[in-house]
Amino acid sequence: MDLVLTEQQRLLAESATRLCADYGGPKRLRALRGAAAEMDVDAWRATIAAGWLSTVVPEHHGGQGLGVFDLALALEQAGRQMLMIPLNEVAAVARTMSGAVDGSRAEAGLADLLRGALIVPATAAAWSSGGRASGLHYDHKAGVLDGTIAFVAYGGSADAFLVAVEYGPQPVLALVRGSQISVATESNVDGSTSSRLTFAKVYVPAESVIATGAEARKLALQLNEFLMLGAAIELVGLAAAALDVTLDYIKLRQQFGKPIGSFQVLQHRAVNGFIDIELNRSLAYRVLAAYDAGEHHPAMVSAVKARASRGALEITRAALQMHGAIGYTEEHDIGLYYKRALALSARYGGELGQTSRFSALTLEPMEASP
Protein backbone atom coordinates (compact mmCIF):
# COMPACT_ATOMS: atom_id res chain seq x y z
CA MET A 1 0.00 0.00 0.00
CA ASP A 2 1.51 3.34 -1.12
CA LEU A 3 1.44 5.92 1.68
CA VAL A 4 3.39 8.63 -0.15
CA LEU A 5 1.37 11.86 -0.26
CA THR A 6 0.18 13.15 -3.59
CA GLU A 7 0.75 16.78 -4.59
CA GLN A 8 -2.87 17.57 -3.70
CA GLN A 9 -2.46 15.96 -0.28
CA ARG A 10 0.76 17.86 0.39
CA LEU A 11 -0.98 21.14 -0.43
CA LEU A 12 -3.87 20.20 1.86
CA ALA A 13 -1.46 19.37 4.70
CA GLU A 14 0.41 22.66 4.25
CA SER A 15 -2.83 24.64 4.17
CA ALA A 16 -4.07 22.86 7.30
CA THR A 17 -0.80 23.56 9.10
CA ARG A 18 -1.13 27.28 8.44
CA LEU A 19 -4.83 27.54 9.25
CA CYS A 20 -4.60 25.57 12.49
CA ALA A 21 -1.58 27.59 13.61
CA ASP A 22 -3.57 30.79 13.01
CA TYR A 23 -6.65 29.61 14.93
CA GLY A 24 -5.19 27.29 17.56
CA GLY A 25 -2.51 27.00 20.19
CA PRO A 26 -2.40 27.27 23.99
CA LYS A 27 -3.14 31.00 24.16
CA ARG A 28 -6.33 30.69 22.14
CA LEU A 29 -7.39 27.60 24.09
CA ARG A 30 -6.98 29.50 27.37
CA ALA A 31 -9.16 32.31 26.02
CA LEU A 32 -11.89 29.84 25.04
CA ARG A 33 -11.73 28.17 28.45
CA GLY A 34 -11.96 31.56 30.14
CA ALA A 35 -15.05 32.40 28.12
CA ALA A 36 -16.57 28.95 28.82
CA ALA A 37 -16.96 28.50 25.07
CA GLU A 38 -17.79 24.98 23.88
CA MET A 39 -16.29 25.54 20.44
CA ASP A 40 -14.25 28.11 18.54
CA VAL A 41 -16.79 29.65 16.15
CA ASP A 42 -14.21 31.61 14.16
CA ALA A 43 -12.00 28.55 13.68
CA TRP A 44 -15.04 26.53 12.63
CA ARG A 45 -16.00 29.10 10.01
CA ALA A 46 -12.45 29.06 8.69
CA THR A 47 -12.47 25.28 8.31
CA ILE A 48 -15.83 25.42 6.52
CA ALA A 49 -14.43 28.04 4.14
CA ALA A 50 -11.39 25.82 3.55
CA GLY A 51 -13.71 23.01 2.43
CA TRP A 52 -12.38 20.34 4.78
CA LEU A 53 -15.80 18.80 5.38
CA SER A 54 -16.31 18.22 1.68
CA THR A 55 -13.19 16.06 1.39
CA VAL A 56 -15.11 13.01 2.63
CA VAL A 57 -18.27 13.58 0.57
CA PRO A 58 -18.66 12.20 -2.98
CA GLU A 59 -18.71 14.66 -5.87
CA HIS A 60 -22.31 13.85 -6.81
CA HIS A 61 -23.32 15.08 -3.34
CA GLY A 62 -21.39 18.34 -3.69
CA GLY A 63 -18.13 17.17 -2.14
CA GLN A 64 -14.58 16.71 -3.37
CA GLY A 65 -14.76 12.93 -3.52
CA LEU A 66 -11.51 12.36 -1.63
CA GLY A 67 -11.35 10.31 1.57
CA VAL A 68 -10.91 10.14 5.32
CA PHE A 69 -7.15 9.83 4.75
CA ASP A 70 -7.19 13.34 3.25
CA LEU A 71 -9.29 14.76 6.08
CA ALA A 72 -6.89 13.17 8.57
CA LEU A 73 -4.13 15.46 7.31
CA ALA A 74 -6.20 18.37 8.62
CA LEU A 75 -7.33 16.54 11.76
CA GLU A 76 -3.73 15.85 12.77
CA GLN A 77 -2.97 19.57 12.64
CA ALA A 78 -6.20 20.37 14.50
CA GLY A 79 -5.06 17.99 17.23
CA ARG A 80 -1.60 19.50 17.24
CA GLN A 81 -2.99 23.00 17.82
CA MET A 82 -5.78 21.84 20.16
CA LEU A 83 -8.55 23.38 18.06
CA MET A 84 -11.96 23.27 19.73
CA ILE A 85 -14.03 22.44 16.65
CA PRO A 86 -16.31 19.49 15.79
CA LEU A 87 -14.47 18.69 12.56
CA ASN A 88 -14.21 14.96 13.19
CA GLU A 89 -17.79 14.67 14.41
CA VAL A 90 -19.51 16.67 11.67
CA ALA A 91 -17.33 15.17 8.92
CA ALA A 92 -18.30 11.70 10.13
CA VAL A 93 -21.96 12.66 9.93
CA ALA A 94 -21.52 14.14 6.44
CA ARG A 95 -19.81 10.98 5.22
CA THR A 96 -22.57 8.82 6.74
CA MET A 97 -25.42 10.85 5.28
CA SER A 98 -23.83 10.82 1.84
CA GLY A 99 -23.60 7.03 2.02
CA ALA A 100 -27.32 6.46 2.56
CA VAL A 101 -29.03 4.50 -0.20
CA ASP A 102 -31.99 6.89 -0.24
CA GLY A 103 -29.85 9.98 -0.67
CA SER A 104 -32.85 12.26 -1.21
CA ARG A 105 -33.71 12.15 2.51
CA ALA A 106 -30.22 13.27 3.49
CA GLU A 107 -29.62 15.70 0.62
CA ALA A 108 -30.96 18.89 2.21
CA GLY A 109 -29.27 18.31 5.55
CA LEU A 110 -26.01 17.40 3.84
CA ALA A 111 -25.98 20.61 1.83
CA ASP A 112 -26.52 22.64 5.01
CA LEU A 113 -23.69 20.74 6.71
CA LEU A 114 -21.19 21.46 3.96
CA ARG A 115 -21.90 25.19 3.93
CA GLY A 116 -21.75 25.44 7.72
CA ALA A 117 -25.42 26.27 8.25
CA LEU A 118 -25.98 23.14 10.31
CA ILE A 119 -23.91 21.58 13.11
CA VAL A 120 -24.72 17.91 13.63
CA PRO A 121 -22.54 15.99 16.11
CA ALA A 122 -22.54 12.21 15.94
CA THR A 123 -24.32 10.23 18.63
CA ALA A 124 -24.25 6.84 16.93
CA ALA A 125 -21.05 5.91 18.77
CA ALA A 126 -23.30 5.08 21.70
CA TRP A 127 -25.00 2.39 19.67
CA SER A 128 -22.27 -0.12 19.13
CA SER A 129 -19.18 0.75 21.15
CA GLY A 130 -19.98 0.16 24.78
CA GLY A 131 -23.70 0.55 25.38
CA ARG A 132 -23.73 4.20 26.39
CA ALA A 133 -27.32 4.53 25.18
CA SER A 134 -29.66 3.90 28.10
CA GLY A 135 -33.11 2.64 27.12
CA LEU A 136 -33.09 4.39 23.74
CA HIS A 137 -36.20 3.26 21.89
CA TYR A 138 -37.91 4.18 18.63
CA ASP A 139 -41.62 3.47 18.27
CA HIS A 140 -42.03 2.74 14.56
CA LYS A 141 -45.82 3.07 14.62
CA ALA A 142 -45.96 6.39 16.45
CA GLY A 143 -42.68 7.68 15.04
CA VAL A 144 -41.42 8.85 18.44
CA LEU A 145 -38.07 8.44 20.16
CA ASP A 146 -37.48 7.94 23.90
CA GLY A 147 -34.36 7.49 26.01
CA THR A 148 -30.98 9.03 26.71
CA ILE A 149 -27.55 9.22 25.13
CA ALA A 150 -24.51 10.35 27.12
CA PHE A 151 -21.02 11.64 26.32
CA VAL A 152 -21.93 13.52 23.15
CA ALA A 153 -19.20 15.94 22.05
CA TYR A 154 -20.28 19.50 21.13
CA GLY A 155 -23.89 18.73 22.01
CA GLY A 156 -24.50 22.24 23.32
CA SER A 157 -23.68 23.77 19.92
CA ALA A 158 -25.73 21.35 17.84
CA ASP A 159 -28.64 22.22 15.58
CA ALA A 160 -29.54 18.54 15.15
CA PHE A 161 -28.23 15.07 15.99
CA LEU A 162 -27.67 11.98 13.91
CA VAL A 163 -29.14 9.27 16.12
CA ALA A 164 -28.84 5.51 15.74
CA VAL A 165 -31.30 3.24 17.52
CA GLU A 166 -31.02 -0.52 17.62
CA TYR A 167 -33.73 -1.29 20.13
CA GLY A 168 -37.13 -2.20 18.71
CA PRO A 169 -38.14 -4.13 15.59
CA GLN A 170 -35.23 -2.88 13.46
CA PRO A 171 -32.34 -0.40 13.58
CA VAL A 172 -33.01 3.21 12.61
CA LEU A 173 -30.68 6.05 11.68
CA ALA A 174 -32.38 9.45 11.85
CA LEU A 175 -31.60 13.16 11.80
CA VAL A 176 -33.33 14.66 14.85
CA ARG A 177 -33.60 18.40 15.39
CA GLY A 178 -32.00 19.70 18.57
CA SER A 179 -34.96 21.90 19.53
CA GLN A 180 -36.92 18.76 20.44
CA ILE A 181 -34.22 17.35 22.73
CA SER A 182 -33.20 18.17 26.29
CA VAL A 183 -29.43 18.76 26.35
CA ALA A 184 -27.46 18.80 29.62
CA THR A 185 -23.83 19.83 29.13
CA GLU A 186 -20.89 19.43 31.51
CA SER A 187 -17.29 20.61 31.18
CA ASN A 188 -14.39 18.21 30.75
CA VAL A 189 -10.97 18.68 32.28
CA ASP A 190 -9.58 20.33 29.13
CA GLY A 191 -12.41 22.84 28.70
CA SER A 192 -14.29 20.79 26.12
CA THR A 193 -17.77 19.51 26.93
CA SER A 194 -19.82 16.34 27.05
CA SER A 195 -23.58 16.38 26.74
CA ARG A 196 -26.35 14.09 27.86
CA LEU A 197 -29.31 14.01 25.49
CA THR A 198 -32.79 13.16 26.73
CA PHE A 199 -35.50 12.22 24.26
CA ALA A 200 -39.04 12.32 25.68
CA LYS A 201 -41.60 11.33 23.07
CA VAL A 202 -39.63 13.20 20.42
CA TYR A 203 -41.47 12.95 17.11
CA VAL A 204 -39.27 11.83 14.21
CA PRO A 205 -41.04 12.34 10.86
CA ALA A 206 -40.50 9.80 8.10
CA GLU A 207 -38.43 12.26 6.05
CA SER A 208 -35.93 12.52 8.94
CA VAL A 209 -35.17 8.78 8.86
CA ILE A 210 -31.95 8.37 6.87
CA ALA A 211 -31.80 4.57 6.89
CA THR A 212 -33.39 1.52 8.48
CA GLY A 213 -32.60 -2.15 8.98
CA ALA A 214 -29.28 -3.59 7.84
CA GLU A 215 -28.35 -0.37 6.05
CA ALA A 216 -28.75 1.66 9.25
CA ARG A 217 -26.60 -0.81 11.17
CA LYS A 218 -23.88 -0.73 8.49
CA LEU A 219 -23.81 3.07 8.32
CA ALA A 220 -23.68 3.43 12.11
CA LEU A 221 -20.77 1.00 12.38
CA GLN A 222 -18.91 2.91 9.67
CA LEU A 223 -19.66 6.14 11.52
CA ASN A 224 -18.22 4.75 14.74
CA GLU A 225 -15.04 3.66 12.99
CA PHE A 226 -14.69 7.08 11.36
CA LEU A 227 -14.98 8.76 14.77
CA MET A 228 -12.38 6.44 16.31
CA LEU A 229 -9.88 7.00 13.51
CA GLY A 230 -10.42 10.76 13.53
CA ALA A 231 -9.88 11.02 17.28
CA ALA A 232 -6.80 8.81 17.00
CA ILE A 233 -5.08 11.00 14.43
CA GLU A 234 -5.91 14.09 16.51
CA LEU A 235 -4.18 12.39 19.44
CA VAL A 236 -1.12 11.72 17.29
CA GLY A 237 -0.89 15.41 16.43
CA LEU A 238 -1.42 16.39 20.07
CA ALA A 239 1.33 14.05 21.29
CA ALA A 240 3.75 15.34 18.64
CA ALA A 241 3.12 18.94 19.71
CA ALA A 242 3.64 18.12 23.39
CA LEU A 243 6.93 16.40 22.59
CA ASP A 244 8.12 19.38 20.51
CA VAL A 245 7.35 21.78 23.37
CA THR A 246 9.26 19.52 25.75
CA LEU A 247 12.29 19.20 23.47
CA ASP A 248 12.52 22.98 23.24
CA TYR A 249 12.36 23.21 27.03
CA ILE A 250 15.02 20.62 27.86
CA LYS A 251 17.42 22.21 25.38
CA LEU A 252 17.22 25.48 27.32
CA ARG A 253 16.68 24.44 30.95
CA GLN A 254 20.01 24.43 32.80
CA GLN A 255 20.91 22.12 35.68
CA PHE A 256 24.38 21.38 37.05
CA GLY A 257 25.77 23.86 34.55
CA LYS A 258 24.42 22.19 31.40
CA PRO A 259 21.11 21.76 29.53
CA ILE A 260 19.03 18.96 31.05
CA GLY A 261 18.53 17.67 27.51
CA SER A 262 22.13 16.51 27.59
CA PHE A 263 21.28 13.95 30.28
CA GLN A 264 20.91 10.48 28.82
CA VAL A 265 17.84 9.53 30.83
CA LEU A 266 15.85 12.43 29.36
CA GLN A 267 17.20 11.74 25.89
CA HIS A 268 15.96 8.17 26.14
CA ARG A 269 12.50 9.29 27.22
CA ALA A 270 12.31 11.78 24.37
CA VAL A 271 13.42 9.19 21.82
CA ASN A 272 10.88 6.69 23.12
CA GLY A 273 8.17 9.31 22.69
CA PHE A 274 9.31 10.10 19.16
CA ILE A 275 9.31 6.43 18.16
CA ASP A 276 5.84 5.93 19.64
CA ILE A 277 4.46 8.90 17.71
CA GLU A 278 5.94 7.73 14.41
CA LEU A 279 4.64 4.18 14.90
CA ASN A 280 1.17 5.42 15.79
CA ARG A 281 1.09 7.87 12.88
CA SER A 282 2.20 5.18 10.43
CA LEU A 283 -0.38 2.70 11.71
CA ALA A 284 -3.15 5.30 11.66
CA TYR A 285 -2.55 6.41 8.08
CA ARG A 286 -2.19 2.84 6.86
CA VAL A 287 -5.54 1.91 8.38
CA LEU A 288 -7.08 5.14 7.08
CA ALA A 289 -5.99 4.25 3.56
CA ALA A 290 -7.45 0.77 3.98
CA TYR A 291 -10.67 2.27 5.39
CA ASP A 292 -11.09 4.47 2.31
CA ALA A 293 -10.49 1.45 0.07
CA GLY A 294 -12.99 -0.67 2.01
CA GLU A 295 -10.22 -3.15 2.85
CA HIS A 296 -9.75 -2.56 6.58
CA HIS A 297 -10.45 -5.00 9.40
CA PRO A 298 -12.65 -3.47 12.15
CA ALA A 299 -10.22 -4.69 14.80
CA MET A 300 -7.46 -2.52 13.32
CA VAL A 301 -9.54 0.57 13.96
CA SER A 302 -9.55 -0.34 17.65
CA ALA A 303 -5.81 -1.00 17.52
CA VAL A 304 -5.22 2.50 16.13
CA LYS A 305 -7.41 4.20 18.74
CA ALA A 306 -6.00 2.14 21.63
CA ARG A 307 -2.39 2.89 20.68
CA ALA A 308 -3.06 6.58 20.06
CA SER A 309 -4.89 6.97 23.38
CA ARG A 310 -2.14 5.24 25.35
CA GLY A 311 0.64 7.03 23.47
CA ALA A 312 -0.81 10.51 23.95
CA LEU A 313 -1.28 9.96 27.68
CA GLU A 314 2.20 8.49 28.18
CA ILE A 315 3.92 11.23 26.17
CA THR A 316 2.08 14.13 27.81
CA ARG A 317 2.71 12.66 31.28
CA ALA A 318 6.40 12.34 30.45
CA ALA A 319 6.33 15.92 29.18
CA LEU A 320 5.00 17.11 32.54
CA GLN A 321 7.72 15.24 34.39
CA MET A 322 10.51 16.52 32.15
CA HIS A 323 9.34 20.08 32.79
CA GLY A 324 9.66 19.50 36.52
CA ALA A 325 7.46 21.23 39.08
CA ILE A 326 6.56 24.10 36.75
CA GLY A 327 4.89 21.64 34.39
CA TYR A 328 2.23 20.90 36.99
CA THR A 329 1.18 24.52 37.39
CA GLU A 330 -1.92 25.94 35.72
CA GLU A 331 0.16 28.76 34.25
CA HIS A 332 2.43 26.54 32.13
CA ASP A 333 1.13 25.49 28.73
CA ILE A 334 2.36 21.89 28.86
CA GLY A 335 -0.46 21.02 31.25
CA LEU A 336 -3.00 21.94 28.57
CA TYR A 337 -1.68 19.15 26.36
CA TYR A 338 -2.04 16.60 29.13
CA LYS A 339 -5.59 17.69 29.95
CA ARG A 340 -6.50 17.56 26.28
CA ALA A 341 -5.04 14.06 26.04
CA LEU A 342 -7.12 12.97 29.05
CA ALA A 343 -10.36 14.10 27.42
CA LEU A 344 -9.66 13.06 23.83
CA SER A 345 -8.19 9.65 24.70
CA ALA A 346 -11.45 8.68 26.41
CA ARG A 347 -13.68 9.93 23.60
CA TYR A 348 -15.11 7.08 21.48
CA GLY A 349 -13.37 4.51 23.65
CA GLY A 350 -10.07 4.65 25.52
CA GLU A 351 -7.26 2.11 25.56
CA LEU A 352 -9.11 -0.40 27.76
CA GLY A 353 -12.37 -0.27 25.83
CA GLN A 354 -10.67 -0.48 22.45
CA THR A 355 -8.45 -3.34 23.58
CA SER A 356 -11.57 -5.23 24.64
CA ARG A 357 -13.19 -4.53 21.28
CA PHE A 358 -10.04 -5.70 19.48
CA SER A 359 -10.08 -8.93 21.46
CA ALA A 360 -13.76 -9.53 20.76
CA LEU A 361 -13.17 -9.08 17.03
CA THR A 362 -10.08 -11.25 16.78
CA LEU A 363 -10.14 -13.98 19.44
CA GLU A 364 -12.20 -17.13 19.22
CA PRO A 365 -14.50 -17.65 22.23
CA MET A 366 -13.18 -20.24 24.65
CA GLU A 367 -15.16 -23.43 25.05
CA ALA A 368 -16.43 -24.23 28.52
CA SER A 369 -14.50 -26.92 30.36
CA PRO A 370 -16.34 -30.24 30.73
Segments the model singles out, each with a brief description of its role:
Residues M1-Q81, G103, G116, Q222-P370:
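Alpha-helical interface subdomain recognition
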Residues L66-G67, G130-A133, Y154-A158:
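Short glycine/proline-enriched turns and hinge-like loops at secondary-structure junctions
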Residues L83-G103:
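N-terminal glycine-rich flavin-associated loop
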Residues R115-A117, R132, S157-D159, Q170, ...:
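A generic structural signal for well-ordered coil/turn residues at beta-strand boundaries
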Residues A133-L136, F151-V152, R177-T212:
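Flexible, small-/acidic-enriched active-site or ligand-binding loops
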